[in-house]
Amino acid sequence: MSSFQSATTRQGLHRRNMNSETPQSEFIQRLRRSPPSESSSSTPSSSTTTSSTTTTSNTSGKKKKTAPSASDFYVPSLPGQPKDSQLILYAGHLSFSPPDTTIEPEKDSYGFFFLNKARHIANRPVLLVWLNGGPGCSSFDGSLMEVGPLRMVLKGDGTLKEVDAAWNEYANMLFIDQPTGTGYSYGPKPNYVHELDVSSANLVNLLARFFKIFPEYQQMDLYICGESFAGQYIPYLAQAILDTNIISAPLKGIMIGNGWIDPINQYLAYPEFAFKVGLVNPSSKAADLVNEELKKCTEWIDSNSTTPIHIEACEGILSAITDSTVQTVNSQKMCLNMYDVRLVDSYPACGLTWPPDLADITPYLSRTDVKQALHAQDHAADWVECEAKVGNNFWAKTSQPSVTLFPKLLDKIKILLFSGDQDLICCHTGTERMIDHLTWAGHQGWTSQAINQPWKVNGSYAGLWKEERNLTYVLVANASHMAPYDVPYVTQDMLVRFLGIDVMTAAGPAAQITSRIGEETATKVNRVVMNETKLGQEGSGTTGLAMTSGPVHDENYYNASSAMLFLTLVGLVVGLIFFVRRRLRRDGHGDFAHHPSDETEIILKNHHHHHLSPDSSLPRSARDRQFQPVPTDDLDDHHLHPNLPSNNTSYQDLPR
């Protein structure tokens, strides 16, 4: 194992800490992945916090604390945001302390939230809480690179663009930075969180404060979602919400993408995945090294009755795999990207600096004007994607892996686990092993009734779908550790299916295209023709639609029905005009009957009206967004890293 791998094996899941200080464990640093921050990101600035209390001045000049209102957190716009954007955003700090307590601001700890309201009104109002992993990684990873409505324009000098297929198309998204010291969250030093039950209690307190300020969201279905090490956060938070009486929002389910949930089965799955996809030749010396590390791991497991969240004796397996991929290309050392094995990266990063969006996101979120717009100015230091000190202090020595909570949770709520098939760090084979060894609802693993069903989005293969007894597993095709980054329309379809949202009544981009699991009917909706361009064609994208069973109907049936409806409406309009003309003639208003040009104009206006969508009353920019063609490269865009020797270099192109 190289010295770099020894110091950074744990960076991956949590993302990017390439030179962490006194690493508590190798694997955490790979989960985290970010460069270390020596800045005081957990230290508040000298300004007065406006999160849990709002400061006002009375007539005597003395400052008085008042409870904040929703308007205090409103974000009219962000620097660089499109001028015609109709997003409704709120952001700011909320205390991690219990809602019925008051602590001096300089002694309190604060989480940061970023609320993106739903663009369309769905049949089921939903609030999604999103958490990124780490420990210590900001949820702006999810917001600005995966499921949020805004993206940075690469090398665009801080310019943002609005995207379709965001998860707030049909659900309200609440991104949270936690635990203390993560992203824009802050608190006095030292005040780091060490255990999962503490982090979940802090989140419950923050959510209780959020619902007090935004009470309308407490009536909505509540879901918690995230990825990577959030596979530990999310089940713990779900159980805490079910156990508490200070949050009345109905928790309906959780979603975890490429999650670190069951350490034992995840570690043991590494060799299987590496051999299966060809990262390591099973007959090579590299395979011997991998198997040596696997033996150390299994010996530790067999001799210990407890299961920590990270097992030191098992962390050499991943290092042996990544070390075996190091090659020299054009005088530069290269290795595979552990988050997307289709790609390569410069050694020893091996994916730690991926995706390339971070080069723009990091300076943007450190800008003073951006902090002010987000009401985050009380976080004094520059924004850091993943704070090393948070992860190094999150020991979790007494916390059991979150997989132990699954049987009880599955008795009460739905759980969706999704895995990008190109991820190594939290490979899908580990999630599948976990399910096979999990006992819930009276049975271990899947029963014979549960089968892998092919999942298609707009006619293209999107992955496999399997569900039974409140558990859904989705293997997402052509996707990395950050699946929504690679296939946004596909993962949006996954979301609306799991939430039970009827996009045909909510409109929006997902209503334009088709989605199908197994033998479901694939229904096309919003089949309209504008400027001779037919929307709803097969291509990259998705729809989460009201699902029925039966054969797929012929497209001609829909076209014939649409034509009949159109002719009927035109006939009604013409009949109405004829009736009005006769009535006016009878009443002596003959002038109307002698102006055929006016008559023609009325007919044309009504003819055009029948080609508009149900949302034609929306402002033009909103309508344009709904009728934009769906991108066709959603399923095969690999987002190659800029450090590759050439734009077409993948791991498979390296000499072996």
Curated annotation (Swiss-Prot):
User: What role does this protein play?
Assistant: Protease with a carboxypeptidase B-like function involved in the C-terminal processing of the lysine and arginine residues from protein precursors. Promotes cell fusion and is involved in the programmed cell death.
What is the source species?
Answer: Puccinia graminis f. sp. tritici (strain CRL 75-36-700-3 / race SCCL)
Q: Where are the transmembrane segments?
A: 560-580
Q: What is the lineage of its organism?
A: Eukaryota, Fungi, Dikarya, Basidiomycota, Pucciniomycotina
Q: Give the EC number(s) listed in the UniProt record.
A: 3.4.16.6
A Pfam family matched in the record: Peptidase_S10
Task: Report the protein name in the record.
Answer: Pheromone-processing carboxypeptidase KEX1
At the top level, the lineage of the source is: Eukaryota
Q: Membrane topology per the record?
A: Single-pass type I membrane protein
Instruction: Name the major location.
Output: Golgi
Q: Which InterPro entries match?
A: AB_hydrolase_fold, Peptidase_S10, Ser_caboxypep_his_AS
